[in-house]
Amino acid sequence: MARGGAACKSDARLLLGRDALRPAPALLAPAVLLGAALGLGLGLWLGCRAGRQRTRHQKDDTQNLLKNLESNAQTPSETGSPSRRRKREVQMSKDKEAVDECEPPSNSNITAFALKAKVIYPINQKFRPLADGSSNPSLHENLKQAVLPHQPVEASPSSSLGSLSQGEKDDCSSSSSVHSATSDDRFLSRTFLRVNAFPEVLACESVDVDLCIYSLHLKDLLHLDTALRQEKHMMFIQIFKMCLLDLLPKKKSDDELYQKILSKQEKDLEELEKGLQVKLSNTEMSGAGDSEYITLADVEKKEREYSEQLIDNMEAFWKQMANIQHFLVDQFKCSSSKARQLMMTLTERMIAAEGLLCDSQELQALDALERTMGRAHMAKVIEFLKLQVQEETRCRLAAISHGLELLAGEGKLSGRQKEELLTQQHKAFWQEAERFSREFVQRGKDLVTASLAHQVEGTAKLTLAQEEEQRSFLAEAQPTADPEKFLEAFHEVLERQRLMQCDLEEEENVRATEAVVALCQELYFSTVDTFQKFVDALFLQTLPGMTGLPPEECDYLRQEVQENAAWQLGKSNRFRRQQWKLFQELLEQDQQVWMEECALSSVLQTHLREDHEGTIRGVLGRLGGLTEESTRCVLQGHDLLLRSALRRLALRGNALATLTQMRLSGKKHLLQELREQRALEQGSSQCLDEHQWQLLRALEARVLEEASRLEEEAQQTRLQLQQRLLAEAQEVGQLLQQHMECAIGQALLVHARNAATKSRAKDRDDFKRTLMEAAVESVYVTSAGVSRLVQAYYQQIGRIMEDHEERKLQHLKTLQGERMENYKLRKKQELSNPSSGSRTAGGAHETSQAVHQRMLSQQKRFLAQFPVHQQMRLHAQQQQAGVMDLLEAQLETQLQEAEQNFISELAALARVPLAESKLLPAKRGLLEKPLRTKRKKPLPQERGDLGVPNNEDLASGDQTSGSLSSKRLSQQESEAGDSGNSKKMLKRRSNL
């Protein structure tokens, strides 16, 4: 049958079919009956679909939750590795050529409703309407579509313009709420396949592609954070080595002391990383456990737990750095000035390292986004290729049906024979399509398994080579010559190694995709050959024997059927090109959204940085009194912690942006399907009547409405997740504030100690000089007398310290006993209070309301225990602090009395005149009174420097008081030593 180029080609073909029926009036009555039966069957089928569409429009959010995402992907970013971008562009061009060669069709002019509405029947569903609208119920025997566990079957958007009109009416009467709590709960419970590598997505039969790809993007961000954290630890060790060499220039790198200090830090970092990995593994295994599927709610929960654990790890690293100075002073007897200088150098170089890590994180996060876009592109190509067999099947069956209709219209084939032949062809074609699907899944999984094994092997070899490269670089490098260049060179080595690993993974993904494409093409051509055999057997063997037609006429009819199928495939190819164009537009829109997210993240980080820096500078400016060195040390520490915190928040912001796209993917996919359907309807025919034009306009209005809904949903979802990010930023800011309060407090404490030490040393030197001069000038001072005074003074100090230790231990035991009594009393009260709750529980069997009230009361009572417990601990801390202050004041008074007695006896021994002897203690008292006040106040801060005390641990109080006692004892020993010096002077005087 000849084909013209007219616009109304399909209508002309249908008229030809009706003309062919007119020469056989004897078959008019059977044809009318058959047409009525077919029309009734088609009407019932459309009624069922319209009912499903009404349900879909009434539950729009549920449908969005269950859509199979295919269009939420991004185009490759313009930033990143140029070589990688060129390779991806070449691969994308190859994939596009493959799609252009074998894009499947989508509709025919016979199956107007099923095919024009882009209804895609699953391969493993055998019961389908036949091409002419009839059906074969005998094939419907326990054959259903495979569905993901815990995921209901979803409906397509409106199946035709008519069903769209009905759906619009129903949708207008439904609720207009978009972002309700119920909608959120349903969407967060959406189930998709748990994947660990991209090749796993390619060979799966039923997957939510976009959610799987975005989950892989989240894994990439986590791997990036792990790599950067390990690099920071390695750079920290190298910087610490350089600082130790500067601090201990006489020590060699293989010195025992040097290695002991270094091994302590390395061991702490290993334990820190090991503990973090255990927590991350436990979080990964929680929730669904070993299940093959996962929900979006589980993903968001795990990402939140990951963020909390990473922040805790970051804070632990801060504490480890802060303890280095105390570690050097306490364990290795390093001077405070040298340790402080080492910390300043370490902080300054770590700031430079954080800057390098921040720049690297920004670039590699964009590179990870580029890889995600490439994965979406490759997944879309595979999706198109897998659909080509179904489109081939539909087009060939539609052409066969049309050819058999022509024979039936000419009276050469009865209706029963036509139905029997169509049923046989449908069964044979769809069974072959199912075989294609089964073989593709089976062989595809084998390809994926081999690809993953090859990737693991290659990664292991690359890791060993990179570790050897790191060792050789560190062995050859001279870090002390130019630390900045060394850090930059070391960072370049590590960054290049990370890029090599990413390139290896991407190359393996491309190789796996190419293998799957080749497999799909191979199976497709094999299936098409089988289809051709079915057609040849039908028209060259079955029809001649059944109808008695000459072989030439059957062969001519076969050629007509093939031409008709080719024409329909051409229409399908044009529609697929339109689909691909819409997909590219969607990628461009998503790319714009990602760029906006990056800009918003940059603005947020700038705001947080300016806010924190302004706060810390304002605090230091109002405090005053700190030296320039102390101020610079505090600002450096704040800058380092702030850089680390902002880098963590930036990565968390990327993860939340990914979760936003995952939440919106359902509505985006629905809107994309509506746009594709509009393009299909616009290109299906140029001759539309008024009713069809109205329905097309209704479809366009539906597209605009869904676009508006998507925009509103996107704004609300972004706002919700951005508020979560701001809350986490506030928590990190509080941690940063706590560390800076401690740092500023320590700086003020050091400043106060230095000022007090200088004043006290000056006054003590003046007083001792005066006393020594008086003793030397006295003729009554002898060696025996001075020795007797010193011995008595030592004995008195020993008794004072013993009494102080006993009183301190007794008071701490008393406080502990009181706390235990209070705890037991509170427990008794709690056990006696729930009597009313038990009575309420007695009625729990009667009404569910009583059970609910009981649960609420128990929850409130349980939550009320926390502030009570905190208040008790605070009260115990206050009591212990008060007792320790009292004991310290008593000890200080007793030591001062002993000192005054020694001075008085020494003055009496020297026969110093009474007026002078009274003047000296008075002067001493005037100097010590303000000094006592200065020494008395910083003592709780000194205890605070040791860490938060534990109420149940008496050793903390012993350590605090013990350190104080040792300080007092060393002070008195120094004074006694000065008295010994005066004794030596008297000996020299007597010898003279």
UniProtKB/Swiss-Prot annotation:
Protein's recorded name: EvC complex member EVC
Please name the disease the record associates with this protein.
Ellis-van Creveld syndrome: An autosomal recessive condition characterized by the clinical tetrad of chondrodystrophy, polydactyly, ectodermal dysplasia and cardiac anomalies. Patients manifest short-limb dwarfism, short ribs, postaxial polydactyly, and dysplastic nails and teeth. Congenital heart defects, most commonly an atrioventricular septal defect, are observed in 60% of affected individuals.
Q: Provide the membrane-side ranges marked Extracellular in the record.
A: 1-25
Q: Where in the cell is it found?
A: Cell membrane; Cytoplasm, Cytoskeleton, Cilium basal body; Cell projection, Cilium; Cell projection, Cilium membrane
The reply on keyword Transmembrane is yes
Q: Where is the composition biased (Basic and acidic residues)?
A: 89-99
Per the record, where are the segments of Low complexity compositional bias? Answer: 156-166
- Could you say which tissues express the protein in this record? Found in the developing vertebral bodies, ribs, upper and lower limbs, heart, kidney, lung.
Q: Which GO terms describe its biological process?
A: cartilage development; endochondral bone growth; muscle organ development; positive regulation of smoothened signaling pathway; skeletal system development; smoothened signaling pathway
The record's note on quaternary structure and interaction partners says: Component of the EvC complex composed of EFCAB7, IQCE, EVC2 and EVC; built from two subcomplexes, EVC2:EVC and EFCAB7:IQCE. Interacts with EVC2. Interacts with EFCAB7. Interacts with IQCE.
Q: Which gene encodes it?
A: EVC
The alphabetical list of record keywords is: Cell membrane, Cell projection, Ciliopathy, Cilium, Cytoplasm, Cytoskeleton, Disease variant, Dwarfism, Ectodermal dysplasia, Membrane, Transmembrane, Transmembrane helix
Q: What does this protein do?
A: Component of the EvC complex that positively regulates ciliary Hedgehog (Hh) signaling. Involved in endochondral growth and skeletal development.
Q: Which InterPro entries match?
A: Limbin/EVC
Specify the domain of life of the species encoding this protein: Eukaryota
Q: How does it sit in the membrane?
A: Single-pass membrane protein
Its cellular-component GO annotations read: ciliary basal body; ciliary membrane; cilium; cytoplasm; plasma membrane protein complex
Biased-composition ranges, Polar residues, are 66-82, 957-982
Region feature (Disordered): 66-105, 151-181, 825-854, 930-992
Side Cytoplasmic, residues: 49-992
The membrane-spanning stretches of this chain are: 26-48
